[in-house]
UniProtKB/Swiss-Prot annotation:
GO molecular function per UniProt: guanosine phosphorylase activity; purine-nucleoside phosphorylase activity; thymidine phosphorylase activity; uridine phosphorylase activity
Keywords: Glycosyltransferase, Transferase
Phylogenetic lineage: Bacteria, Pseudomonadati, Pseudomonadota, Betaproteobacteria, Burkholderiales
Pfam family, one: Ppnp
Family to which the UniProt record says this protein belongs: Belongs to the nucleoside phosphorylase PpnP family.
HAMAP family from the UniProt entry: Nucleos_phosphorylase_PpnP
Name of this chain's protein: Pyrimidine/purine nucleoside phosphorylase
Swiss-Prot/TrEMBL catalytic activity: a purine D-ribonucleoside + phosphate = a purine nucleobase + alpha-D-ribose 1-phosphate; adenosine + phosphate = alpha-D-ribose 1-phosphate + adenine; cytidine + phosphate = cytosine + alpha-D-ribose 1-phosphate; guanosine + phosphate = alpha-D-ribose 1-phosphate + guanine
Amino acid sequence: MITEKIDNISVTTKANVYFDGKCVSHGITFTDGTKKSVGVILPATLTFNTGAPEIMECVAGACEYRLAGSDSWVKSAAGEKFSVPGNAKFDIRVAEGFEAYHYICHFG
């Protein structure tokens, strides 16, 4: 199931812009204090570092990801999720000529 709408949240209006604009996200906070981010990654290959564990939920487009210590790229498309451990690195790539990867990042 794809998350299409999120109700009852507070949105940080200033965007987080990474990698010269190849990744742009906004922080959201739920009434219970839970924090997530929603964003988009344009065609590129990027490396991220995590603090807390993350679940990346694809809501549109697709990407390939590679967790630290792995040589394999794994595809993630709309409606799919993948988990990244805390205090880890992972690579994510969106192929040129394809739709941007739209995501919700669930922390913790």
